[in-house]
């Protein structure tokens, strides 16, 4: 089966690498975002997908937009028509980053076939993995569906569930879903080509939305229950990074865990820090949390216990992270 591929970030590049090794599929070309400025020098770099595609000798198209009124409009439509003539029957999509205009949805026989990181219709949108963890979902998964005009509303072609571990971060779940989703996408594309795939419309019942994340969404309010805080920290690791302020300085948090059953700890106000030789605890709206990793201002993420050993003067003052009622004053 001949296909095109559209994607941009590292997870999409991993999927592309898998599709390129599948003897049942032939990738004719790749669509990705234009080169972007990264790093300290702010020099232009190709997307991870572009790097994989160029390394494989594939033609790469770096259009700014697919819209009919964009400067690339004519080139986009002429190129897709040429690929269709060459036998491409589907566009595999993984985190491409641009909207697919209505007039291009049927540019090839089987349309644009997307790998989405949730069990649709739950968590439609840009941040499904983070939303699932923050909500306390015990299960998520990957869904392959055909793109239509609505946001992640198209008919589903296949699904695969994944159980979320109680310590797993968004990064870790994303890796697992990429690894399972790449095979699911390949198999589904082959089924489409063979005519054995059975599209299923998405029910509206149970539909939820996961909008794009912003740094403000990752702010921790330590007056919330411990389980809510712990989920938020896992959901926003590594990016944008769960954070809170102490004396006007921003600290980021990695893994935070509930204290073990029967473990002794002092009574702590929400946001209050406490440490002994082996533990760093922070107060919440109910039971304290054990802080495993922390990123102080201007530093890298480190073990909280190591950080605390150099902060005896600070900890002796019973410091307290800001909570929402403090910052609202």
From Swiss-Prot:
Record-level GO cellular component terms: cytosol
Q: Which Gene3D superfamilies match?
A: 3.40.50.12230
Q: What class of enzyme is it?
A: transferase
Q: What Enzyme Commission number(s) does the record list for this chain?
A: 2.1.2.9
Task: List the GO molecular function terms.
Answer: methionyl-tRNA formyltransferase activity
Entry superkingdom: Bacteria
Q: Which Pfam families match?
A: Formyl_trans_C, Formyl_trans_N
Q: Tell me which UniProt keywords the record has, alphabetically.
A: Protein biosynthesis, Transferase
Instruction: Give the matching InterPro entries.
Output: Fmt, Formyl_trans_C, Formyl_transf_N, Formyl_transf_N_sf, Formyl_transferase-like_C_sf, Met-tRNA-FMT_C, Met-tRNA-FMT_N
Cite the binding residues for (6S)-5,6,7,8-tetrahydrofolate. Answer: 118-121
Q: Which reaction does it catalyse?
A: L-methionyl-tRNA(fMet) + (6R)-10-formyltetrahydrofolate = N-formyl-L-methionyl-tRNA(fMet) + (6S)-5,6,7,8-tetrahydrofolate + H(+)
What role does this protein play?
Attaches a formyl group to the free amino group of methionyl-tRNA(fMet). The formyl group appears to play a dual role in the initiator identity of N-formylmethionyl-tRNA by promoting its recognition by IF2 and preventing the misappropriation of this tRNA by the elongation apparatus.
UniProt record similarity statement: Belongs to the Fmt family.
Name it.
Answer: Methionyl-tRNA formyltransferase
Originating organism:
Corynebacterium urealyticum (strain ATCC 43042 / DSM 7109)
